[in-house]
Amino acid sequence: MAVEKMSIAKALNESLRHALDTDPKVLIMGEDVGKLGGVFRITDGLQKDFGEDRVIDTPLAESGIVGTAIGLALRGYRPIVEIQFDGFVFPAYDQIVTQLAKMHARALGKIKLPVVVRIPYGGGIGAVEHHSESPEALFAHVAGLKVVSPSNASDAYWMMQQAVQSDDPVIFFEPKRRYWDKSEVDTDAIPGPLHKAVTVREGSDLTLVAYGPMVKVCLEAAAAAQEEGKSIEVLDLRSMSPIDFDTVQASVEKTGRLVVVHEAPVFYGSGAEIAARITERSFYHLEAPVLRVGGYHAPYPPARLEEEYLPGLDRVLDAVDRSLAY
């Protein structure tokens, strides 16, 4: 058993290295992914070891990067595309929505598009405009895409491998402020399904559901609530499309209460879909309305204000208290 403690950034690097090493059809493309190793060094050393034909520095043109990846996928390759920052994905949105997500259905299933689009996302790093956004709901809304986000190093390692092996396009959101968080990774493990939610803390009074960067906050909230005698269950959703509603439903029907937490704005966020589905499925098990905690319906603020914008421990605990007060 090969168990090693590593950061999310290191786990992603090792997973990408494994993909390149085991499948000659895997390519990595993006701005500064080669010689520089990416702005977060996720692809560090890969061009040196696998060559410029497989780890490709591209022009600053996201639409062209994704369009090229689509063409390569049609020719039998498995491209992994890096979008340097979350706010830079929008020039490629047309290619992703009108081509990448739809070609399989358009061709009646006769072609596959095994493309992974990596997107470092979210705030918390004191960045400038266009560098701290959480646009995952825009992609989860699009049929034909898988949309996932790991919260820890083990999931980063294994979910990336599963994404690369998928014959469907995967939008892989990486929580950039968690890149340096470390945890154990078992590289010989047998991972669960890519879309499957995981219970990361057992509880009986209320369910917290989160993904990506907010899982850590929810675990901290559950630990704080425990000191006051409140038993909080925490689910790591892992996948925003498809969503593992069965696991969420089972937890909510045990606890009777649900709070959904994400960094993206609450308005039209993934939490709204989860709240609606659980209300439809488990209405008579609910002891309180489903509550949501997230960002505000406003452009992401300057770095000096982001701590006020980002949902943190206090806002999660406030929602927990409001739910338990019903």
What do the predicted segments below correspond to?
Residues 1-169, 173, 308, ...:
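Thiamine diphosphate
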